[in-house]
Amino acid sequence: MAKNVIVVGTQWGDEGKGKIVDWLTDHAKGVVRFQGGHNAGHTLVVGEQVYKLNLVPSGIVRDGVECYIGNGVVLDIHHLLSEIAELEKGGIDVRSRLKISPGCPLILPYHSAIDKARECAKSEDKKIGTTGKGIGPTYEDKVSRRGLRVYDLFNPERFAEKLKEVLEYHNFVLTQYFKAPAVDFQTVYDQAMADAEQIKPLVTDVSAALYAANKAGSNLLFEGAQGTLLDIDHGTYPFVTSSNCVAGQASAGAGIGPGMLHYVLGITKAYCTRVGGGPFPSELDIETEGAPGYQMSQVGREFGTVTGRKRRCGWFDAAALRRSGRINGLTGLCITKLDVLDGLKELNICTGYKLDGKIIDLLPIGADEVVRCEPIYETMPGWTDTTFGVKRWEDLPVNAQSYLNRLEVLCEVPIAIVSTGPERDETILKQHPFK
């Protein structure tokens, strides 16, 4: 009988999901993206080769694994084709194994133009830190029922008709409100039609394909992007992404019933990071040499895969993780980047907050309350021996084991996996999600 696993980020993204998805794919016949777009950045290290993926599911680097892009993903086809070309240069067979839902909303040039113009117009304290890829405006078009989808590409006359209508609206906003240049209809149309010819062989009823694979007994892995605290409904709104990043979205964003989902693995760093604006209760100074935040930033190489921006760093926030655990219904946790904490004399864990004179043990909903939270810390001793590359639990320093055990208790979720480095075999397994 098939067993299907969802991998989700439990923080503000960048938790190391790509490596874990790649590692778990050894037990899966298919890997599915179900939300987000090319604002996601997954880095995989396989031997000497480093792969940086935005849209193509991480399972593509495993021979014989089918990869699916579900209807919940917003798709920049031009970017996808570039990504495919890069993978093919490295000798990876992509086109025979990649399947794209015809229901994916299309990201077109006017979406990124709106995205960038809108962010530029905001004051510094209101900036979300968008990647400028057009993700948000594409989701807006989807819910306002004016967006174009992959299936529209294959009816050129109807595509042109819809494009003229939506472009008239967006160009009015660009030129009249943002005082930005208009986007040319013919340029957008010609590029879309050229891309359509290349993408057509990959378009498949993904929902039906996943149902058939599950019925045939194939294990499936659902690969989340971003993180729970960036979720449009459950994150630190409005400093969030434009999609649902939680486990429940795997069902809607891939077109499968929730009864087909069996295990939810939450990925979290051994500390916290965040890119862009928004509240971050346990944030540390990352600029002062020798400070814990500086070590996290430098040793952890905390720079965004997509934007290259410095990530903000802070202590592990168990109160935030507790919220993520409940929203996602986590079955198990995977802790990544434990080695980044090697050498710190003491480690703090945020166990709750002081908010308006009260003590709470769960991250509040919405940015307005989160920004007023003062972290409450529990201090634990650090360790001097390295954890990098350790492959057995018993070989971890005693204090590292104690730290992880405490996280497990505070988060109310058992630890299934500990990642101790970027390579596939730099992994400690306590409970296999597929077994």
UniProtKB/Swiss-Prot annotation:
Active-site residues, as the UniProt record annotates them: 14 (proton acceptor), 42 (proton donor)
Residues binding substrate: 305-311
Chief location category: cytoplasm
Cofactor: how bound: Binds 1 Mg(2+) ion per subunit.
Presence of the UniProt keyword Cell membrane in the record: no
Binding site for Mg(2+): 14, 41
Binding site for GTP: 13-19, 41-43, 311, 337-339, 419-421
List of residues binding IMP: 14-17, 39-42, 131, 145, 226, 241, 309
SUPFAM superfamilies per the UniProt record, alphabetical: P-loop containing nucleoside triphosphate hydrolases
One of the GO biological process terms: IMP metabolic process
Entry EC number(s): 6.3.4.4
CDD domains associated with the record: AdSS (cd03108)
Pfam families assigned to the protein according to its UniProt record, in alphabetical order: Adenylsucc_synt (PF00709)
Pathway(s) this gene product operates in, as recorded in its UniProt entry: Purine metabolism; AMP biosynthesis via de novo pathway; AMP from IMP: step 1/2
The keyword Cytoplasm appears for this protein: yes
A GO molecular-function descriptor: GTP binding
Catalytic activity: IMP + L-aspartate + GTP = N(6)-(1,2-dicarboxyethyl)-AMP + GDP + phosphate + 2 H(+)
Major enzyme class: ligase
GO CC terms: cytoplasm
Cofactor(s) listed in the protein's UniProt record: Mg(2+)
Keywords: Cytoplasm, GTP-binding, Ligase, Magnesium, Metal-binding, Nucleotide-binding, Purine biosynthesis
Cellular compartment(s): Cytoplasm
Quaternary data: Homodimer.
Function description: Plays an important role in the de novo pathway of purine nucleotide biosynthesis. Catalyzes the first committed step in the biosynthesis of AMP from IMP.
Family membership noted in the UniProt record: Belongs to the adenylosuccinate synthetase family.
Name of the protein this chain belongs to: Adenylosuccinate synthetase
Organism encoding this protein: Dechloromonas aromatica (strain RCB)
Phylogenetic lineage: Bacteria, Pseudomonadati, Pseudomonadota, Betaproteobacteria, Rhodocyclales
